[in-house]
Amino acid sequence: MKKLISAVVSLIIIIAIGAAAYEAYLKKPSADALTEPIVIGNGMTTAQIADVLKKSGVISSNAIFTAVADLTGRFNEFHAGTFIFKEGMSAFDALKTLSVQGQTEISVTIPEGFGLKDIADRLVQNKIIGSDADLFKVTGEPAKTANIDATLLKDYPFLADKPTNASLEGYLFPDTYRFYAPTDAETVVRRMLDDYAAKVAVLSPAPDYPTLILASLVEREVKDPADRAKVADILNRRIAAGMPLQLDSTVNYATGKNLASVSSDDLNVDSLWNTYKYPGLPPTPICSPGLDSINAALTPTPNNYLYFLTTPDGTVIYSQTLEEHNAAKAEYLK
């Protein structure tokens, strides 16, 4: 009987040691399940860190985590910072993660009037994403048709207003955001769509897709908020009269350039976004408009002008006739 009891106890000990070794070193995390960012503060003890990690689903045993930290001396290598873990990690792998410098949260400002290319460049510059292509996989590319993920469309009902093959141009709301470097592009896009939902989709009335396009044109064409509602009215009346909008900003969007004065070759570029060549609104917005421009597009100010130009210093010159407009161009755009 004593031998049997001894054998059972030995077996239990072996199983316990095996389980502990598995939890400590061999356990594999979930391939896809990532935690929310976890902050490890200066001065936190091993026990406190273990408690935070267990509550977040990173580890399953505080005791094993603490024991491995003590045995390996890893506690002396911990960094304070913000970390993202995989759920269900071994204690050893969690400790290795903590020995690497934590992620840095970076403040990134997306100004009003930025297009998808500008936004992608700004995110790459701040090491939030690796390349422009990372963002475009989620949003589609500027001045091209796109195939947006169905789950994303379902999660943001206001996107149902856009054409099926349109990119997310215009929907990434201009604001100041805080992202961890790096952050996957879909997370970035969702954060910006959340901002649009909170600040634009709640307007009464909310802008429909043509209004969002109009707002983006106003945003790129004029700088002073006082001019935007007046210009919105001019553009609406030009469309109603069958007149081409003839906006340099749309040509720049089609060519990917940012020229103060577009070339004759650019004016002839065969793109649906070229409003010199094709009448009406372009197929998509050409940038992310701010609230001032959106409100201007929603409530244009009636006026008698059909033409306008913006001088190099941002002043808007209005004209009622083509002759007046040509004279203004000769005077102000020398």
Residues covered by each model-derived region:
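Signal peptide-directed extracytoplasmic domains
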Residues: 22-199
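A broad, low-specificity signal for short, low-complexity segments enriched in glycine/proline
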Residues: 2, 42-47, 67-71, 266-271, ...
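Short low-complexity stretches enriched in small and charged residues
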Residues: 5-7, 35-37, 76, 232, ...
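Short N-terminal secondary-structure initiator segments
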Residues: 13-17, 33-46, 111-114, 245-262
